[in-house]
């Protein structure tokens, strides 16, 4: 892939980058097509661009998805929405939903910026109606139902009363009802009961009012495993960025990684047997070997938990990471290989090396966290 333009996360001198995250918008488009092939043309797709689009750059991801016909976008909170709107001119018919339950002092920001607000309780609905009335404007809201995640949302038992309150508020416009699955990769049992609770709420509302409302529940795992949960709209996050929702599970959808996290070899040396590498001397050379130092550490997003667990790709060859990963640098055991030189590219995860899922398993975490951890000092480059 060749670089077409750059998104700088920090000012950098001319010359090769030390660490960079290559962002393939072509792979993003491919992944969207894979998702649409599953859901069908009648199902809307909400592009989840919270957390800076899982570290990929919310501005460029949103623009790419809009060009592919996506008009719904999800962010974590109102501040993420405002940042996106300041950096990108959204199309007139595009919508942003902020998932967080708002503080009362933030409600006017939703009105100012035209962001859809999540309502989880009566107090928020009443405050929103009062503020919207004072502004002389209508506020678009979506009801979040807690069917079993235990995080945000009204209980199914209280949902009908809250929906009646929203309906009675002339300055609130209900644009959707949604829920979130706790175990979306396991469609039977608890997840099936969550969906049943949710559909009971939405069905009762539509029967009582004679209105239809946008219903959405399926995140990446449910898109794959729960056809009945796709409803009117789906919310792909990790799947959109090319990772399977369960890192240990075989991929059933041919998505491609959108990010490649890579750095540079900045030093190579030969060490004798018994030489300890890095802090706390957690690894020692069993025999004479060559050690490469790479200019990326945990401050760049290469987790310390990967110490002595990860593998790194250099020149198409896989090498074990050795010693404790430090804040700014990582060491790799080259063995007797003498082909690696200073300046070579070292792929930490991506299409030319180990996957984010493989590294996540080695670190005892999930690919979501690895993608979101790639830090600001790593330059994002669109390819």
UniProtKB/Swiss-Prot annotation:
It comes from the Bacteria. Substrate binds at residues 151, 327. The modification N6-(pyridoxal phosphate)lysine is found at residue 50. Keywords: Isomerase, Pyridoxal phosphate. GO terms for cellular component: cytosol. InterPro entries: Ala_racemase, Ala_racemase/Decarboxylase_C, Ala_racemase_C, Ala_racemase_N, Ala_racemase_pyridoxalP-BS, PLP-binding_barrel. The active site is at 50 (proton acceptor), 279 (proton acceptor). GO terms for biological process: D-alanine biosynthetic process. It catalyses: L-alanine = D-alanine. The keyword Isomerase applies. Its cofactor is pyridoxal 5'-phosphate. GO terms for molecular function: alanine racemase activity; pyridoxal phosphate binding. Its EC number is 5.1.1.1. It is an enzyme of class 5 (isomerase). Belongs to the alanine racemase family. NCBIfam families: alr. Catalyzes the interconversion of L-alanine and D-alanine. May also act on other amino acids. This is Alanine racemase. It comes from Chlorobaculum tepidum (strain ATCC 49652 / DSM 12025 / NBRC 103806 / TLS).
């Amino acid at each position: 892939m060749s670089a077409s333009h750059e998104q700088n996360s920090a000012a950098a001198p001319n010359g090769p980058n030390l660490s960079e995250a290559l962002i393939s918008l072509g792979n993003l488009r491919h992944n969207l097509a894979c998702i649409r092939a599953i859901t069908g043309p009648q199902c809307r797709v909400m592009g989840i661009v919270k957390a800076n689009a899982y570290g990929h750059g919310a501005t460029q991801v949103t623009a790419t998805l809009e060009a592919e016909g996506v008009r719904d976008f999800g962010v974590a909170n109102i501040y993420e929405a405002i940042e996106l709107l300041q950096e990108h001119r959204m199309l007139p018919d595009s919508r942003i939903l902020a998932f967080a339950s708002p503080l009362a002092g933030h409600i006017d920001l939703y009105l100012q910026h035209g962001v859809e607000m999540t309502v989880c309780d009566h107090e928020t609905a009443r405050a929103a109606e009062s503020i919207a009335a004072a502004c002389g404007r209508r506020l678009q809201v979506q009801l979040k139902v807690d069917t079993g995640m235990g995080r945000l949302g009204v209980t199914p038992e209280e949902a009908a009363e809250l929906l009646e309150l929203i309906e009675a508020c002339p300055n609130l416009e209900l644009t959707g009802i949604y829920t979130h699955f706790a175990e979306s990769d396991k469609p039977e049992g608890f997840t099936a009961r969550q969906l049943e609770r949710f559909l009971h709420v939405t069905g009762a509302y539509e029967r009582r009012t004679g209105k239809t409302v946008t219903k959405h529940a399926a995140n990446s795992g449910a898109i794959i495993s729960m056809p009945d949960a796709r409803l009117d709209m789906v919310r792909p996050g990790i799947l959109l960025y090319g990772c399977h929702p369960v890192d240990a599970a075989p991929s059933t959808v041919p998505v491609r990684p959108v990010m490649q996290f890579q750095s540079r070899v900045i030093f190579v040396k030969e060490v004798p047997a018994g030489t300890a590498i890095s802090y706390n001397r957690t690894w020692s050379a069993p025999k004479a070997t060559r050690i490469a130092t790479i200019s990326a550490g945990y401050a760049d997003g290469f987790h310390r938990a990967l110490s002595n667990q990860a593998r790194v790709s250099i020149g198409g060859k896989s090498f074990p990471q050795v010693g404790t990963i430090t804040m700014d640098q990582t060491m790799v055991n080259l063995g007797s290989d003498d082909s690696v030189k200073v300046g070579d590219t070292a792929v930490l995860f991506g299409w030319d090396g180990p996957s984010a899922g493989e590294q996540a398993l080695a670190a005892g975490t999930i690919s979501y966290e690895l993608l979101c951890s790639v830090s600001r000092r790593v330059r994002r480059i669109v390819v």
